[in-house]
């Protein structure tokens, strides 16, 4: 019967420290617990003394950019994370761009790419040839029996990552 409350400070933690911990918690929720950034975050953790240190720095970056005050789209979260990566690991930002691309397409067949991503690297002609061949041979998309090449193209995605062409299949996946 007691009203819900939130601790704002204790005799051990100041208000500012509690807020800082809440910000770090939000970064862990968004970038780790969501499961949307698995590849990127696993690699990015190696750039810091500890995972906590990384999330603390990311929270400080959000605070510096006043990003906690705004609700962000999923694509917006990718853009903020990429900006953070450029600031902290500029010399490896290309590698992280590919990891972010992989994370993004593992989750969803994104139609609008974040601004920092270049084109997929797979030309229209290459994609058309792949789906035309796949329509006849069903080498990679056996579960798409009964679908024509246009339907398969809408239900999958081709992306060039690290010099290799990767096929993302969205028919059978975890949500």
Ranges and model annotations:
Residues 21:
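Conserved, mostly hydrophobic/aromatic
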Residues 1-2:
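Flexible glycine/proline-rich, aromatic-decorated loop/lid segments
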Residues 7, 15-18:
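Polar, glycine-rich mid-to-C-terminal structural blocks
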Residues 26-175:
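Radical SAM enzyme core and accessory elements
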